[in-house]
Amino acid sequence: MGFCFPYIKRKKAGDPMNKYPHLFEPIQIGTQTVKNRVFMPPISTNLANKCYVTEELIQHYGARARGGVGLIVSEVVTVEPTYIYLPGDMSIHDDSFIPGWEKLCAEVHQYGTKILAQLFHPAYMAFPIPGTPQLIAPSHVGPYYAKSAPRPVTKEELKVLVRQFGEAAKRVQKAGGDGVEIHAAHAHGLLGGFLSPLYNKRCDEYG
């Protein structure tokens, strides 16, 4: 079921009830002009099929754009194929994902809404589907519920991951996306783990 925002209506200038006079004004973010300041944060739907954009995903984000949101940040989008965060999440780790993203971006753009892809590497938070190799992390520390400890990611692997993030961002651009957000929050996934003293016990330049 699509969810719109029927309450997104501009109030008259000087209206004493309007406590946020700039909410519906455009805002400049880098090279992008967003039509208003109502942003949709990343919210997982798990509507992808084998990491590919589906019609359900297009309808989901299209409904929010149609409702008046100025900018949408997508749910997590993985940058490499080895580790899957959750079944039903999206990826853009090779060019085969670009056509689906082109359709998604076109759907959102027809309503004047911008869309960013939230790029992510799940690392020690990856879903342990059969065949998944040992999970990686900044160091040997994993979440409390893990059945086995992850292995520390190597410096060589980190160089590859940097390239994979860059290549994923380029694919988003090719598909018509307006930018990317890098998920590095609350010790969640690889980059968030590097920023947390609970998970990052390294003694090298990455510690």
Per-range role (PLM):
Residues 5-207:
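Flavin-dependent oxidoreductase catalytic cores
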